[in-house]
């Protein structure tokens, strides 16, 4: 095989393979097969086979030509990350040059060679859905419940941008918010995944970003929107129609910058105001007479949104291919967000609530080098920087803290409402991580491909209170005292420097009768911290006890095998089996929170609670996944996929109670929690029925464990409940989930889509009587089921060389009030309580309902 120059980053490319035959069914040698508008191509060998490696994810026109044969082009060839696209073709012999024959490729309704559950959506498919951001796309997939993949905890998912981890090591969530305008492809792996992917136990989301184009291209989008409530009184708000609640403006330019250099630059501004409004009757510095129940409001009485968000975001890419067989690129993605989290308690004193500011940037260099016609390597360098602040005033010494005092309410005015003061809690979190990832790929022959590589991460994670405000008696009077880095009781902001590394090797064998994917991954983690040598003397302060000096944490090594097999049982049907071990080190924010054991210096038997102590020397959490499925392309446009899965979850973070030498007891994190998840998914995809397409995803699942949160056991013990581990449904367990998408489209004319999301109720813990019932089994009740419908309609027009469209999007079309939100423990209903007096604060809170109907009107253009 001969390959033409090309290159792209790891985790963003796939390959195209196939066979070229004559109209007499004989293989055709030396046919030129290339992707129009690119440098990617190959020649066929004696068997008529060709393979084009290292093709960036996207949609292409594949052209076949050779002297003595007709020229054919196949439009709409879709390439997905880390997957093989097969495109066979038949060329008719001819003695004269004939007009080119153009055919359109159709993605098969199921991919019979795929060995695990995964979905790849192209930019065109994403645009047609009523979604705006990456998370909207992810939550529509089978087996995903509000970010939980197949029953796992929310922090068990690896989010990647162009094949490199974009997770924040503090909580293992994505550092970025990605708008759909940036997405070339989204790959969601909810089953087992290759050895290349680590630091995840439940799933992988790989967002492939768009890149520069060979010709200059400019596109943009803008929309305005608001809320339209069917019955405001049910939601406890007064305004039925709230226009102007959100606005977005996005612009993207791409094209050639210089010879062999392409650029992409995209920017977006987005503003959102929540539908629940507050009234500024009070200001933080008001002086109400709380003893006599006499308020003294001095606010201006204006209506203001209790929650809002203003965001600037964007991306930049610069790609150069001047050097032979070399591709160098720089990319950056960023978000700047300023907003306020909705807190209904501040509805009359909105200026007393804290604001949140976020700055995130994910940027770096990529080097792709073709070493030979069948071998290439990728090397990526990234900085993942994330900064988050949550407080009312930036400076802890701001005199407005003294003037306002703590947030206070008066039940005589309105129970649960703060009418004076400000929130005194303060928090900041910064992650500055440097990542290196590299891999080498070799196409051994037309059947076997091998890949090996590794990655190294150096995160610096800081978090804590940037100054703690505490009221203390000084000279007989209540005085607001500042504590800045005053350990062990007020430690301030601390920085931690763990190291994560991994190496992997994997192979893919693709034959007409078998697809095999297998690999091994070796993970390394070192918290680079200390723990007490003897937990029974945690602060080395117990008289007469054996000494307990701090000792370094140990480095952890884990070897994880991965295996996937697909057997085509006929041309249009296949079965697959997948198995794998998946390890994940707990988030830095979890294991290091409250990890200074000097706080236990005065620990006495029967003493006060010190909370749950952190533990940086825990083992990695582990999940073993099993998956088996059957997929069948019933027709050229109708496919079905049935997959059964089981997850054995072990070594989850939980709480142990440690007995000290002086008969005291404290709680600390360790690997004691466990669980499992079992279920199946059914996907039916009808690509085309005239202009109509239908896709249905159904998930049945049962997810149980001994706790939904690492600190849950300690919480039960403090409440006087039985802390012993026992199986209960996870908080996010959901027996049934159904996603139905119906779309109708005519190319370059119109499109419309409706997405229906239906779900059975998640668990809750019932209460029998007011103040009683804590002994009820956790999560033994079920919330009501719910359904939400979203829709999108678009009309396209062409004005000279500009493609324009107008569209409307409606979220929660039927204005549903409930979808697995808050319920009252006495009734299991979100609407009423058996104990209205004790639950009055919650009954008055409209934020417990699902977000109301939201209408957006927008326009797009491209030229």
Question: Residues of each region from the PLM?
Answer:
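Periplasm-facing N-terminal accessory domains of Gram-negative outer-membrane beta-barrel systems
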Residues: 5-104, 109
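Periplasmic N-terminal accessory/gating domains of Gram-negative outer-membrane beta-barrel systems
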Residues: 70, 75-86, 99-204, 208-211, ...
């Amino acid at each position: 095989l001969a390959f033409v120059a090309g290159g792209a980053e790891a985790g963003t490319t796939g390959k195209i393979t196939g066979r070229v035959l004559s109209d007499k069914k004989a293989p055709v040698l030396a046919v030129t097969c290339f992707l129009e508008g690119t440098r990617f191509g190959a020649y066929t060998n004696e068997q008529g086979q060709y393979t084009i490696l290292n093709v960036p994810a996207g949609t292409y026109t594949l052209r076949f030509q050779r002297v003595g044969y007709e020229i054919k082009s196949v439009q709409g060839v879709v390439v997905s990350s880390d997957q093989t696209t097969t495109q066979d073709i038949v060329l008719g012999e001819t003695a004269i040059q004939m007009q080119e024959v153009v055919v359109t490729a159709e993605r098969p309704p199921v991919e019979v060679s795929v060995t695990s559950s995964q979905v790849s959506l192209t930019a065109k498919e994403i645009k047609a859905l009523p979604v705006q951001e990456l998370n909207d796309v992810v939550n529509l997939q089978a087996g995903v419940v509000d970010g939980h993949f197949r029953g796992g905890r929310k922090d068990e998912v690896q989010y990647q941008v162009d094949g490199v981890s974009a997770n924040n090591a503090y909580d293992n969530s994505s550092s970025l918010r990605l708008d759909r305008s940036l997405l070339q492809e989204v790959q969601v792996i909810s089953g087992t995944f290759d050895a290349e992917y680590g630091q995840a136990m439940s799933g992988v989301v790989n967002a492939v970003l768009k890149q520069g184009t060979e010709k200059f291209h400019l596109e943009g989008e803008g929309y305005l929107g608001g809320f339209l409530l069917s019955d405001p009184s049910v939601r406890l708000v007064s305004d039925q129609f709230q226009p102007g609640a959100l606005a977005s403006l996005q612009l993207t330019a791409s094209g050639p910058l210089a010879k062999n250099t392409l650029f992409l630059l995209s920017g977006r501004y987005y503003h959102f105001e929540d539908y629940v409004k507050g009234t500024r009757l009070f200001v933080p510095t008001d002086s109400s007479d709380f003893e006599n129940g006499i308020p003294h409001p001095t606010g201006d009485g204006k209506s203001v949104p209790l929650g809002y968000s203003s965001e600037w975001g964007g991306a930049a890419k610069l790609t150069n291919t001047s050097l032979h067989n070399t591709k160098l690129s720089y990319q950056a993605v960023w978000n700047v967000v300023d907003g306020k989290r909705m807190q209904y308690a501040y509805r009359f004193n909105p200026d007393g609530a804290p604001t949140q500011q976020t700055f995130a940037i994910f940027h770096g260099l990529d080097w792709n080098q073709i070493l030979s016609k069948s071998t290439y390597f990728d090397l990526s360098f990234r900085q993942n920087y994330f900064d988050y602040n949550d407080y009312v005033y930036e400076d802890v010494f701001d005199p407005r803290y003294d003037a306002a005092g703590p947030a206070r309410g008066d039940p005589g005015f309105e129970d649960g409402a703060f009418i004076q003061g400000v929130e005194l809690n303060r928090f900041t979190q910064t992650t500055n991580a440097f990542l290196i990832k590299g891999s080498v790929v070799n196409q051994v022959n037309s059947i076997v491909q091998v890949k090996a590589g590794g990655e190294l991460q150096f995160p610096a994670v800081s978090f804590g209170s940037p100054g703690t405000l505490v009221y203390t008696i000084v000279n007989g009077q209540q005085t607001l005292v500042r504590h800045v880095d005053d350990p062990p009781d007020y430690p301030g902001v601390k920085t931690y420097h763990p190291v994560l590394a991994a190496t992997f090797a994997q192979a893919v064998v693709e034959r007409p009768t078998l697809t095999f994917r297998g690999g091994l991954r070796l993970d390394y983690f070192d918290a680079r911290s200390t723990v007490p040598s003897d937990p029974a003397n945690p602060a080395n302060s117990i008289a007469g006890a054996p000494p307990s000096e701090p000792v370094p944490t140990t480095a952890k090594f884990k070897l994880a095998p991965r295996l996937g097999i697909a057997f085509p049982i006929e041309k249009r049907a296949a079965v697959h089996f997948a198995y794998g071990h998946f390890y994940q080190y707990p988030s830095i924010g979890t294991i290091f929170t409250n990890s200074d054991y000097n706080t236990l210096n005065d620990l006495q038997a029967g003493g006060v609670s010190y909370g749950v102590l952190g533990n940086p020397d825990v083992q990695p959490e582990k999940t073993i996944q099993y998956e088996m499925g059957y997929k069948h392309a019933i027709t050229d446009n109708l496919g079905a996929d049935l997959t059964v899965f089981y997850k054995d979850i072990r070594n989850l973070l939980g709480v142990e109670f440690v007995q000290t030498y002086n008969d005291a007891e404290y709680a600390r994190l360790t690997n004691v929690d466990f669980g499992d998840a079992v279920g199946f998914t059914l996907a039916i995809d009808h690509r085309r029925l005239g202009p109509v397409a239908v896709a249905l995803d159904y998930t049945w699942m049962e997810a149980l464990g001994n706790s939904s949160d690492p600190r849950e056991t300690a919480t039960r013990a403090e409440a006087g409940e039985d802390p012993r581990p026992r199986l209960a449904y996870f908080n996010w367990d959901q027996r049934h989930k159904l996603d139905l998408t119906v779309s109708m489209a005519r190319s370059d004319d119109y499109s419309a889509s409706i997405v229906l999301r239906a779900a059975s109720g998640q668990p809750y813990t019932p209460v029998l009587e007011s103040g009683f019932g804590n002994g009820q089994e956790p999560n033994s009740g079920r919330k009501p089921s719910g359904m939400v419908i979203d829709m999108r309609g678009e009309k396209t027009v062409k004005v000279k060389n500009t493609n324009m469209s107008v569209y409307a999007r409606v979220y929660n079309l039927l204005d549903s009030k409930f979808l697995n939100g808050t319920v009252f423990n006495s009734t299991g209903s979100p609407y009423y309580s058996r104990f209205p007096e004790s639950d009055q604060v919650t009954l008055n809170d409209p934020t417990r309902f699902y977000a109301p109907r939201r209408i957006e009107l927008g326009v797009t253009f491209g030229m």
